[in-house]
């Protein structure tokens, strides 16, 4: 593995050397690449927030302390440094630096919160003249996460004590101000993750020893105004996030660290931390259905199953090579059948977490469906699902959902009873004292290849009787979904005929029981035909009448010759969430170059159009040579070669026509009709990019982002193993890149061998690859035509990209992660190792991140282009992590299962609902490998899959053009799925989507501004003149169409389906309001002949 890391770092250094040569020519804002390298957490922290030299001290402390302890110690050391004359301003600066550095350590030196989430730290006075510490939080503190935000408040208290300050002593009005802000934030801005009671806010506001304050983040004003120590009358969103989603919500963790550090004044948190006591006799855990995920039903995104409803997804434990980190497996036949699930589509789920990404796994159970002709079939492959989809009348069972043990561990959710499956059955036999040691069934081979083992009904009963194990899952039906009475009715019906090759029965209402049990059968000539194996299993299991009982399976086991297990004791409810995505990153409108042209380029910001006007006046920054006083837009003076100094930006007249002509000549590009610039620069220095770069981007049809990098966004999906065939790369090329052996230790010779993915290798989407080919051509043109260097990439096809380096970056972070392209996928996603995603502080529950060619970022990125507003440094590669250390990344990846099978004890104990930590001793996961060579290799999977991109590549939601078609497909699907109540879906769409949307749009229409079509100026009210100052026409910013867009479809749904009368009346009242808004309410005089 060290050879792999060293090779990555050698190639990175090679790219840096090219970038250094290019930047040294002085044609950019800086003469050196502006993305520093960082090998570990300590270097990332120093590169992100400083101070200089802190990396060495962090590494010293890391040896014998946890990350949190290091953060507190570093904070105290920085803050308590000697200050001349105890200067308050210098002490404030040290306290500010201490808090930022400590927060950066807590967040792995990745997220932007230490830079953007803390506005400033001040030392202020209480009303008794004692001094205290105040932390000004800003909105981006959210990116730190609740725990880090909470600990930043605790660290501030630690700093307060280290520098000898008193505690914050709020007065009543200040406390009540917090209470009002929380209520206003939730009613006017957005919901908090945790909604505290007013008394909880009062307690926190009065007891926290430092002032948790902040900048105004919203225009909403409070009634507790003009407070002496609060500088704003607006809502302080950052402060509320730190207090509510931080300190209050994460109270147990804050209290834990406060006790460890022996910090006084935090005991009040125990009121938030005490777990409810169990009453006497409350030994058994009862897990109720959780309906939270269906509280908001969105139009066009179907509900696939109501909470714990029969026929929903069945829980199956295990991790496939493409699941984990919140991605969960579904059979590709289910995906093909539903069409709304593609590879990477998000699902909102009942448990164990809130959401996941769907990926295909074909070694689990697929759906059971009833066709229009009455047949009931199990669908076992995507091709069959595609063929019969139009014939499906009802989806009786959605199939399995493969959920890793780590998902329960991460969410601290009790284990749910496991579904009876083949891998459990095999382990049960192998552990049976009656099973011979010579393994007559060759189960040691099939224990990880159970899908290859075919067992007849006769053999299944013989094995069960001989080795005293439950009946094979193939012949165990969904008995728990029917009553004892229904099974007795079924038994009587079965006994009306004799089993020969098949069992042929008269068509009777009892057929519905067969359907619910999931027994495959055909309908032929008004007769029901059951295959020999299924008929044999039913008749033998139901050989005697069942005694009345509330537990059907228990009653069945009293009469069955072999033990019957519950096939699906846990059903998981779901609904479709966010669609998958793979798309180039574009600003709106999308520029080719960060060069300001004001309004001269029209609405398209077209530079050639602006150049036709000759000279233009724009606000721009320029550099001046201190030697010869020549003004330019370069870091080295084009006249004398001296370093230039960037001056203050201001309004300047520039000859754009001449600049454009010279730039085109410099890069030997003939006239282009469209090169898009920007209206104005939003950076502090307002220093523009060279026009040559925009010309070359336009030539190659690529677009720049706010920091001058070119990016492509994709949904994140995990991958620990792959085959050469599914990533479209030859065996020979993979061997060149270091993949010489498969995951079982055999020499790599075949396209279908399974290889273990290296931790910084990525599989990008084909769309991403095609875009990066164009980016590579742009970079080569830039090197050759602008910097006068040799071309580097020389790519013609996407296959030529294999082996090249990329930088991965998540939107809320400021540290990019080094990666290497290893292949391509047809899915709309970027597959990477769980460590890679965790290094960006992301998981795979539909998060999407960007990739950029590393050389493009090194050549073009500059901090000078970043917005000067709050949050401007988020989503920018301020530092590049070159090596992933599993111990220094987000700990969610530490929960990844690494076993080739789920231990038998997990299956057996799952029926007792234990906490995941209670069975952790039999689990092998990443956490147990940290600090060992095994943390990088040998991370096995329990379930294989044929292809990681099997099934639909694009979900139906994205394919259907109109909301009406989306909703009709949503309702049609609801009618077919047994686990869904169609009426509830219709009411849910109306209540949580359409009606609130229309009401909000009516409100927006009545409050809207007007906009000038010529200069884009906006007015709160129409000017008395009726036109803009520039003479342009004024138009509304909210159209009538946006107000009424859901009205007709709402009325149609209400008329077609029997919904609640109250909802019907709400629609009628809303329609009356809309008509009143757009039509005159005056009664019109009519002639008498209207009534004749």
Swiss-Prot record:
Pfam families: PolC_DP2_cat, PolC_DP2_central, PolC_DP2_N, zf-DPOE. It comes from the Archaea. One of its GO terms (biological process) is DNA-templated DNA replication. InterPro entries: PolC_DP2, PolC_DP2_cat_dom, PolC_DP2_central_dom, PolC_DP2_N, Znf-DPOE. Keywords: DNA replication, DNA-binding, DNA-directed DNA polymerase, Exonuclease, Hydrolase, Multifunctional enzyme, Nuclease, Nucleotidyltransferase, Transferase. Its EC number is 2.7.7.7, 3.1.11.1. GO terms for molecular function: DNA binding; DNA-directed DNA polymerase activity; single-stranded DNA 3'-5' DNA exonuclease activity. It catalyses: DNA(n) + a 2'-deoxyribonucleoside 5'-triphosphate = DNA(n+1) + diphosphate; Exonucleolytic cleavage in the 3'- to 5'-direction to yield nucleoside 5'-phosphates. Heterodimer of a large subunit and a small subunit. HAMAP family: DNApol_II_L_arch (MF_00324). Belongs to the archaeal DNA polymerase II family. Possesses two activities: a DNA synthesis (polymerase) and an exonucleolytic activity that degrades single-stranded DNA in the 3'- to 5'-direction. Has a template-primer preference which is characteristic of a replicative DNA polymerase. This is DNA polymerase II large subunit. It comes from Methanothermobacter thermautotrophicus (strain ATCC 29096 / DSM 1053 / JCM 10044 / NBRC 100330 / Delta H).
